[in-house]
Amino acid sequence: MPKLNITPPDLRRILCFVAEAIGKEEAHLNSLDAAIGDGDHGITMRVGFEAVKAKLGALDASVTIDGVLTESGAAFMGATGGAIGVLLGKMLMSAGAALQGCKEIGTSELRVLLNSMEAAVASAGKAKPGDKTILDAVHAANQAVATTAEADESLPNMLSRASLAAGTAAQNTAGMRARVGRASRLGDRVLGHPDPGAVSFSIIMRAMAEWLEER
């Protein structure tokens, strides 16, 4: 069976599919954020990915993997405000820098992508796993692929594994107290509510896995 690697045109389609998935979850993400924040997280995510989708539509057909990621990150950051705009923008741009010159995303490149994203969000957000942030989901996805034997795992299966790990980690943030950001000032009031950023990342990973599985 041929390897189902992700080409630059594939990556553009995947990110557009992610934008649609985020749009469908806008109200849910706003509801999650209303419990511990301003209630506009879903709006921010939708606006950011609408900007990504518009940017991707304007890019030349010859754009590379790193170009898709870098331009997407810049578009997301430029269209949104607040911490999540900076974090997701830097995650995408960091992944682009880490995959410079890469022609396709396979299993080894997925590891590089997630590892660079975790490093970017940890640095920009000054957070660590367990702080009830998007990092909890990113870290879980990264760990899931880091512990997978490359020879025994296809890219769709590896991405599915990462998606499941991110989803579980996002839900587990409901039992955590926030240690960074504005939510950290709410104390026990955040208990029982999952972190909206972590849930958003799990939606992104799920959409990526679904697109590749259905291709």
Where do the PLM segments sit?
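N-terminal loops that bind phosphate or other acidic moieties
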Residues: 1-215
